[in-house]
């Protein structure tokens, strides 16, 4: 049983936990199978309409990511993915259909999932395939510009169709710490933060910052920024800033220092932090730091749309203390991160729209392609080799998070 067949049962489980919001994404190829068709696929549109209505039945607000590491293969093979400016028009057609069809069902939208990941996972982030001897850095930033312009167009179109729509950008967040107080390490950390912030600078402020323009000039990166691009970026900035946060990062200019593993963001191992099974360093205070950094910089509402712990959960043959899956490690991780964002809101004055953990149910991990790297409150009997019944089991964290929601975070 896949999510297509079981979404009603799964949404009922989310409602049992008390979900107020459910973050999901729309597969571009379900709406336009090739990506460049003139007319959408009604069957795909109807499927998502049914999903949204099922959410609404339980009082759950959909939070919809339009593009979540997916690009129709036809667009990659025929046009080169987001390297091609024609992608902007294909995307405009897609979002116009979505905003029109779901005008009364969806209010909160995210244009691109973790848009800065184009620099680290270019095929996932923008459908990029590089030819031999191709300037990959040039291709990444050309593609990024096309996505940024497309995002601004989506914001414009969304507000024209329904002024109540709330459109957000999204980044894979987590501040870089300098490994030492050496000025070179501090400078390196600033450079890495800017590398990621540039995407939000453009979407939240409406223009490329000077440091980015100087970087393009220095690196010989050239792409066409038309007057229309400048106008659309300037006048159609996002309503909120969403982000994923799993861990902070660390960097040094020194040699011989240990590196982190298991993450698309390569960095220096922080000796003050513990690590997950996959080498991601656990830093709840880093979430508070990241939130303050983003809010101070942009003064726009924030939305934490991914935060969680990937772990190798074990499904027991029989219940122990009432649970088939006892994931106290996940409860501990989420508890400390909830404390951190509560402090950011209550003590620091950060404007936070909401929090959606990653993920509510087990699914294949994007970073490793494994089912074994589980994040959900609900265990899905599916394994790396494809075996399993797909049966759902409530983990210990399911019941814990239900109490967290019911108490609005007071009972942790």
Descriptions of predicted regions:
Residues 5, 12-15, 46-53:
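N-terminal, well-ordered alpha-helical segments
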Residues 35-36, 46-412:
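Active-site region of glycoside hydrolase catalytic domains
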Residues 1-3:
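Short, small-residue-biased leader/transition segments that mark boundaries at the very start
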């Amino acid at each position: 049983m896949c999510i297509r067949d079981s979404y009603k049962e799964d949404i009922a489980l989310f409602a049992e936990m008390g979900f107020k919001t459910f973050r999901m994404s729309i597969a571009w190829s379900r709406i336009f199978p090739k990506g460049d068709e003139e007319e959408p696929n009604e069957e795909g549109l109807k499927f998502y309409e049914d999903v949204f209505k099922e959410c609404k039945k339980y009082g759950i607000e959909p939070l919809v990511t339009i593009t979540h590491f997916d690009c129709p293969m036809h667009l990659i093979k025929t046009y080169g993915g987001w390297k091609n400016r024609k992608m902007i028009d294909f995307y405009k057609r897609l979002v116009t259909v979505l905003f029109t069809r779901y005008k009364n069902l969806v209010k909160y939208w995210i244009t691109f999932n973790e848009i800065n990941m184009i620099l680290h996972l270019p095929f996932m982030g923008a459908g990029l395939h590089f030819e031999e001897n191709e300037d990959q850095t040039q291709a990444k930033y050309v593609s990024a510009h096309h996505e940024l312009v497309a995002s601004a167009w989506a914001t414009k179109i969304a507000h024209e169709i329904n002024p109540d729509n709330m459109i957000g950008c999204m980044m894979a967040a987590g501040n870089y710490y300098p490994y030492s107080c050496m000025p070179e390490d501090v400078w390196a950390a600033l450079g890495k933060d800017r590398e990621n912030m540039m995407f939000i600078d453009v979407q939240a402020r409406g223009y490329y910052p000077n440091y980015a323009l100087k970087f393009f000039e220095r690196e010989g990166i050239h792409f066409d920024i038309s007057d229309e691009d400048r106008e659309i970026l300037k006048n159609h900035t996002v309503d909120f800033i969403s982000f994923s946060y799993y861990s902070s990062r660390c960097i040094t200019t020194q040699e011989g220092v240990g590196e982190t593993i298991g993450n698309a963001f390569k960095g220096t191992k922080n000796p003050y932090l513990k690590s997950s099974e996959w080498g991601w360093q656990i830093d709840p205070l880093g979430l508070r730091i990241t939130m303050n950094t983003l809010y101070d910089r942009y003064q726009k509402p924030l939305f934490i749309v991914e935060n969680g712990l990937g772990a190798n959960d074990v499904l027991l043959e029989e219940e122990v203390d009432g649970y088939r899956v006892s994931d106290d490690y996940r409860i501990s991780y989420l508890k400390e991160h909830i404390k951190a964002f509560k402090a950011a809101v209550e003590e620091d004055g950060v404007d936070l729209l909401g929090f959606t953990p990653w993920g509510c149910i087990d699914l294949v991990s994007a970073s490793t392609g494994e089912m074994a790297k589980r994040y959900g409150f609900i265990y899905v009997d599916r394994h790396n080799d494809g075996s399993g019944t797909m049966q759902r089991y409530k983990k210990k964290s399911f019941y814990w998070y239900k109490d967290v929601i019911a108490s609005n975070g007071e009972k942790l």
